[in-house]
Swiss-Prot record:
Protein's recorded name: Altered inheritance of mitochondria protein 18, mitochondrial
The organism of origin for this protein: Vanderwaltozyma polyspora (strain ATCC 22028 / DSM 70294 / BCRC 21397 / CBS 2163 / NBRC 10782 / NRRL Y-8283 / UCD 57-17)
PANTHER family named in the record: FATTY-ACID-BINDING PROTEIN 2
Family: Belongs to the AIM18/AIM46 family.
One Gene Ontology MF term: intramolecular lyase activity
Compartment(s) of residence: Mitochondrion
Name of the coding gene: AIM18
One Pfam family in the UniProt entry: Chalcone_2
Transmembrane spans: none
Amino acid sequence: MFGRVFNRSSPIIRLSVRTITSLNGARASVNRPLAKTLISNGNHIFNKKLYLLGLFGITSGYYFTISNGGSAIINDENVNDDASKTVSVDSSISPLPVNYSKNEYSLSNDYSLLGYGIRAVTFLKFKIYALGIYVADEDIKSIAKLFSTSYLSSTFIDTDKSKSHPENVKEALNDPKKSLILIGNLLDSGIKMMAKITPVRNTDFNHLRDGITKTVLNHPNANEKKTELENGLAQLKETLSNKGSVAKNDDLFIELKSNGSLVFTHNNRKKNKAIHLGTVTDPIVGKFLFSQYIGGPKPLSPPTKETVTDKIYSIV
């Protein structure tokens, strides 16, 4: 069901909304686009009730009643039958798990979803892949700690005394220049993360490699770090030198280790097999890649950056 419209002429409307949940306690729920697309011409109570339902992770059926005087548009594309465990990014591929265990796909850590979105080429108007950003469970507390340090707080974050610390963090992360610095500090702290790329159309390793390389080179500081990047990008080329294809709905896992290295794993769904592709040991490649994924002036996937920002806001 997409874009269901209830007109003003309806005297009383009853909506059945099922399996609405939160993303690990985040202020924005897993089905965040659902909450964002509610329009009721001033019926703020309706929107607030939905928000609270998502916040507290209630998954049982629930009914809302809207009296005459407003219209509502509801988009439930992100509502899944098991929404507490997955989030739908695009209907053409499998939903993203909210959690990964290190026992799965030979991953190095247990991970929780930090943000998600679609990577799309705007001028060609087509989607390329779904992007999920995960953080190691043991490092979640480190995010709050980092954004609360006295130096960052006084210099970059808590500059508006009329706002709370979380509100100032969110505003700073939405500032292109501050975001670049704050995310850079986060990545320099040794935080362990993972990016999950799931193509929405058949592709190959050459295209994925070229895309990742371009993403790294588009980092605002890439020009001044060209010499340092050469070795790391050569490693990246070698790691993704496989001439094979990557089918739609396959997964490419990119783990960012505490030392800044990147570990690449291909999940071949047809063969039900996880294949280790290699490691890029130069930390500048990992830092620039994940910086482009979750922050900076020109994020690779704006929806992903937005959901990551919302999650950090809920953590701090």
